[in-house]
Swiss-Prot record:
ATP binds at residues 16-18, 73, 205-207, 271-278, 342. Present with 104000 molecules/cell in log phase SD medium. NCBIfam families: PRK00290.1 (NF001413). Its main location: cytoplasm. Binds to ribosomes. Binds close to the ribosomal tunnel exit via contacts with both ribosomal proteins RPL35, RPL39 and RPL19, and rRNA. Directly interacts with nascent polypeptides. This interaction is dependent on the ribosome-associated complex (RAC). Interacts with SSE1. Keywords: Acetylation, ATP-binding, Chaperone, Cytoplasm, Hydrolase, Nucleotide-binding, Phosphoprotein, Protein biosynthesis. Its EC number is 3.6.4.10. This is Ribosome-associated molecular chaperone SSB2. GO terms for biological process: 'de novo' cotranslational protein folding; cellular response to glucose starvation; chaperone cofactor-dependent protein refolding; cytoplasmic translation; protein refolding; regulation of translational fidelity; ribosomal subunit export from nucleus; rRNA processing. The gene is SSB2.
Length: 613
């Protein structure tokens, strides 16, 4: 890689199933990986020798299911006892354990048991995306804009930001996926000038968002947002997988539920069938020797696929209704409905949405897999002063807080301070008081959600305001100040008005939140793993070079015509050097240096023997 640092910031769409990276240098470019693919699987695999990320990891998943990790986005920022985590664990082949209430992934790597947080796995995928960009740009990349589902809560946003830090990136901004896609749509279609209401329907591999935006004169204002952080293509695959499992059991009497390899192979076949059914109405699914020597063969119609997922498909309309209601806009006022995310290719999803909007033509002008990274790259260029076009220089993004933020009051009642769909950044205040006489400490539990009962919302963290002057109950004036930044991340301060005493948190003791020491430790570990990957690659290369050189010299020595060109008496020296080289290849775990030395030694002897007689 050439020296120098890229002055801009790359845009990364960190997806549940696939990730995508884009850069902006006078225009947006989606960058293909070394396989030539413009999206890279969000997979990390661990083997006794090395770590694989992306296509290489996904391609060996069936052979190494227990140590191939995916879906980290479904774990990030969640508690171990989260209902969705517990449900997902039943379908994942890798092991998730509870460490202090947080989910941690356990794998075998370099013949040891290792544990990784979801942030660390996500950081590995981010590092891969960063390297893909660096290979194209030819410079070191330090800054990025990373996207998250609009419906991600504070803990999930902060954990994603932490993943960026672990990967060595300076995350300039966390932006919402549908908002990023809206930029791609507005710029790509040259439609950012004309005033319009646009609904972004973003159904990906693992998450679902709907955002309603008002676009006018380069100003993108999010009016409302809704979604489900646990709905996407993976769930449609799971329903197909269950259907095929039952069919296989009915035909053969065999249950593959506990066989990770068979499940992975059948899931891959289910995913392939799902994709095929977007363009044809019937497909055949075949998996040779799926389990116990029995083959699996089945035919699947599009109608059956739609039937198996009918409830999930129908549920995608609920957030659409919600955003219209929240923005107080009727469906007839929506100018465009824009499809984003690979799962919007499913014909039934498109039909339900079009029917909801009374037969409206859906907008498919942007690439559903690439739009989010495209928008993130534009935002990265704006934040680093690299955007040069007239279209982007006046572009302004006004996003919203997806869920209400507030504090727990007496009786576990949720006191909202920042209502959902408030434009961010924002500062909101609310006053509280004491509930008993001479109370000197008040605890502020901070929640995010929409339920009246605090227990049904997400606890983000808590802190105490101490040394309140002794007064009768209800007299002290305590002000809670909520600041939400442009990343959607919250800082809370509480002030006792008569003394000015204050206490604040950036929700530091929250769910899955890493301390700066933990992040630093993970950054160092990430560097070590990268160094180990590089050392393994060098060793592999050195071994291949030596093996191929040894093979060519063996051919020379045994070929009567070629060996006749050797100096007299040198054949035995070459044979001795060959046996040294072969011995180096037999060593249990030779270093790249040892293999290189063996190659140089053999070359020296051969060169002398070949020089003019």
């Amino acid at each position: 890689m050439a020296e120098g640092v890229f002055q801009g910031a790359i845009g990364i769409d960190l997806g549940t199933t696939y990730s995508c990276v884009a850069t902006y240098e006078s225009s947006v470019e989606i960058i293909a990986n070394e396989q030539g693919n413009r999206v890279t699987p969000s997979f990390v695999a661990f083997t006794p020798q090395e770590r694989l990320i992306g296509d290489a990891a996904k391609n060996q998943a069936a052979l190494n299911p227990r140590n191939t990790v995916f879906d980290a986005k479904r774990l990030i920022g969640r508690r171990f006892d989260d209902e969705s985590v517990q449900k997902d664990m039943k379908t994942w082949p890798f092991k998730v354990i509870d460490v202090d209430g947080n989910p941690v992934i356990e794998v075998q790597y370099l013949e040891e048991t290792k544990t990784f947080s979801p942030q660390e796995i996500s950081a590995m995928v981010l590092t891969k995306m960063k390297e893909i960009a660096e290979a194209k740009i030819g410079k070191k990349v330090e800054k990025a804009v990373i996207t998250v589902p609009a419906y991600f809560n504070d803990a999930q946003r902060q954990a994603t930001k932490d993943a960026g830090a672990i990967s060595g990136l300076n995350v300039l901004r966390i932006i919402n996926e549908p908002t990023a896609a809206a930029i791609a749509y507005g710029l790509g279609a040259g439609k950012s000038e004309k005033e319009r209401h646009v609904l972004i329907f973003d159904l990906g591999g693992g998450t679902f968002d709907v955002s309603l935006l008002h676009i006018a004169g380069g100003v993108y204002t999010v009016k409302s947002t809704s979604g489900n952080t646990h709905l996407g293509g993976q769930d449609f695959d799971t329903n197909l997988l269950e259907h095929f499992k039952a069919e296989f059991k009915k035909k053969t009497g065999l249950d593959i539920s506990d066989d990770a390899r068979a499940l992975r192979r059948l899931r891959t076949a289910a995913e392939r069938a799902k994709r095929t059914l977007s363009s044809v109405t019937q497909t055949t699914v075949e998996v040779d020797s799926l389990f116990d020597g029995e083959d699996f063969e089945s035919s699947l119609t599009r109608a059956r696929f739609e039937d198996l997922n009918a409830a999930l498909f129908k549920s995608t309309l609920e957030p659409v209704e919600q955003v219209l209601k929240d923005a107080k806009i009727s469906k007839s006022q929506i100018d465009e409905v824009v499809l984003v995310g690979g799962s919007t290719r499913i014909p039934k999803v498109q039909k339900l949405l079009s029917d909801f909007f009374d037969g409206k033509q859906l907008e498919k002008s942007i690439n559903p897999d690439e739009a989010v990274a495209y928008g993130a790259a534009v935002q990265g260029a704006i934040l680093t002063g690299q955007s040069t076009s007239d279209e982007t220089k006046d572009l302004l993004l006004l996003d919203v807080a997806p869920l209400s933020l507030g504090v727990g009051m007496q009786g576990d009642i949720f006191g909202i301070v920042v209502p959902r769909n408030t434009t961010v950044p924002t500062i909101k205040r609310r006053t509280f008081t004491t509930v008993s006489d001479n109370q000197t400490t008040v605890q502020f539990p901070v929640y995010q959600g929409e339920r009246v009962n605090c227990k049904e919302n997400t606890l983000l963290g808590e802190f105490d305001l101490k040394n309140i002057p002794m007064m009768p109950a209800g007299e002290p004036v305590l002000e809670a100040i909520f600041e939400v930044d442009a990343n959607g991340i919250l800082k809370v301060t509480a002030v006792e008005k008569s003394t000015g005493k204050s206490s604040n948190i950036t929700i530091s003791n929250a769910v899955g939140r890493l301390s700066s020491e933990e992040i630093e430790k993970m950054v160092n570990q990430a560097e070590e793993f990268k160094a180990a990957d590089e050392a393994f690659a060098k060793k592999h290369e050195a071994r291949q070079r030596l093996e191929s050189y040894v093979a060519s010299i063996e051919q020379t020595v045994t070929d009567p015509v070629l060996s006749s060109k050797l100096k007299r008496g040198s054949k035995s020296k070459i044979e001795a050097a060959l046996s040294d080289a072969l011995a180096a290849l037999q060593i249990e775990d030779p270093s790249a240096d040892e293999l290189r030395k063996a190659e140089v030694g053999l070359k020296r002897v051969v060169t002398k023997a070949m020089s003019s007689r």
